Amino acid sequence: MDLKNLTQEERSELSLIDVAHFILEQRKETILFPELVKEIQAFLGLKDAEIRERLVQFYTDMNIDGNFISLGNNMWGLRAWYPMDAIDEEVQTQTTPKKKRKSDDDDDEEILDDDVDYDDEEIVEELGEEEITLADVLLDEDEDEDDHLPDGIEGDLATVEDDYTDGDYTEDPEDK
């Protein structure tokens, strides 16, 4: 079907898909989507606002229609141009083997050097020069310093009594 001979009124009745198919048949090569849209707009004589309104539906229709194929990077062509075997090959990308990275063995040795060897008596003596006696341990167990506040503060603290000691939690004690 030759769309070039149609009047402007007949062209306005065509769908964007039909015009896209016609343009791709005439060019006989792939085309970027924005370029295809510009050619459709020029062919149909549509304003920018009109083409923007129909653009989303047009893109959806191109994806659903079996006559078009997206070749990646927003390139479109006609599916009839490609045999089925070639389509799968063009869509697949070649994977390149990953480069081997040099291992960071030096870092591991530094970490191992930082570890304390408890079999070496000199290092252990340096780490624990303070001797702890049994009296120190018993003192720590019996008396926690956190339990006692400095003088003067304990007397300033008020004791809060629990008003809910009777087990009735439904009513506020201040309302009684």
Curated annotation (Swiss-Prot):
One of its GO terms (molecular function) is DNA-directed RNA polymerase activity. It comes from the Bacteria. Residues 91-119, 140-176 are annotated as: Disordered. GO terms for cellular component: DNA-directed RNA polymerase complex. InterPro entries: Asxl_HARE-HTH (IPR007759), RNAP_delta_N_dom_sf (IPR038087), RpoE (IPR029757). Residues 105-119, 159-176 have a biased composition (Acidic residues). Keywords: DNA-directed RNA polymerase, Nucleotidyltransferase, Transcription, Transferase. Pfam families: HARE-HTH. Residues 14-81 form the HTH HARE-type domain. Coiled coil: none annotated. GO terms for biological process: DNA-templated transcription; regulation of DNA-templated transcription. RNAP is composed of a core of 2 alpha, a beta and a beta' subunits. The core is associated with a delta subunit and one of several sigma factors. Belongs to the RpoE family. Participates in both the initiation and recycling phases of transcription. In the presence of the delta subunit, RNAP displays an increased specificity of transcription, a decreased affinity for nucleic acids, and an increased efficiency of RNA synthesis because of enhanced recycling. This is Probable DNA-directed RNA polymerase subunit delta.
